[in-house]
């Protein structure tokens, strides 16, 4: 699989470094890859002795109508914290469209990040800041391991992590970020 914890940490660290120390993480579940991404995000948000409570993990429905209803209910809170990290590009882009329909400017009023670096992350406006995972490398690793196991080889490590990296685009307002 991919290193979901690292991806979550990279997003959290980036938002924290931009001054969004109260950012919220949004996912459809609190298990598996979503949970690993949340734990990484949470860890990054706890720099400088700060605490990131479970209330900053928002679980949204699989159903679009219910998700949009949740975004509407939480809109004042979202605008207060000014940054949202989504566990998928799909949900991030859907939320961006919802916010734009409400007249909210991205990233000026709210910064948004996704996860996956899907093809749509570059097509949406503003272009989505996200975590890139190399799907072809992931498939290659899986196939290679499968062939080795089929040949009778005993593999020592069953869970190999494919590296991920942050892709900075236009959906985050980089306030308080030092120039490098």
What is the role of each PLM region?
Residues 1-13, 17, 73-80:
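Alpha-helical recognition/docking segments in bacterial nutrient-uptake
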Residues 1-10, 26-70, 85-93, 115-118, ...:
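Hinge/beta->alpha junction and helix N-cap segments in small-molecule ligand-binding domains
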Residues 13, 17, 39, 43-47, ...:
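Short, well-ordered alpha-helices that flank and scaffold nucleotide-derived cofactor binding pockets
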Residues 20, 38, 125:
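ATP/adenylate-binding site constellation spanning eukaryotic-like Ser/Thr protein kinases
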Residues 20-22, 82:
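Short acidic/polar active-site loop segments enriched in Thr and Asp
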Residues 22, 52-56, 105-112:
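Short acidic capping loops at alpha-helix termini that bridge into adjacent secondary structure
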Residues 68-180:
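Flexible loop/turn connectors
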């Amino acid at each position: 699989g991919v290193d979901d914890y690292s991806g979550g940490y990279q997003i959290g660290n980036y938002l924290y470094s931009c001054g969004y120390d109260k950012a919220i993480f949004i996912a459809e579940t609190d298990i598996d890859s979503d949970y690993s991404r949340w734990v990484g995000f949470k860890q990054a948000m706890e720099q400088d002795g700060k605490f990131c409570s479970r209330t900053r993990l928002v679980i949204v429905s699989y159903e679009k109508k219910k998700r949009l209803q949740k975004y509407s209910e939480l809109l004042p809170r979202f605008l207060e914290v000014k940054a949202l990290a989504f566990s998928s590009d799909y949900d991030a882009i859907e939320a961006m469209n919802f916010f734009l329909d409400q007249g909210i400017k991205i990233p000026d009023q709210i910064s948004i990040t996704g996860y996956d670096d899907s093809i749509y992350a570059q097509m949406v406006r503003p272009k989505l800041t996200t975590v890139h995972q190399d799907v072809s490398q992931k498939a290659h690793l899986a196939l290679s391991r499968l062939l080795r196991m089929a040949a009778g080889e005993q593999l020592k490590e069953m869970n190999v992590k494919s590296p991920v990296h942050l892709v900075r685009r236009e959906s985050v307002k980089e306030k308080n970020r030092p120039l490098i």
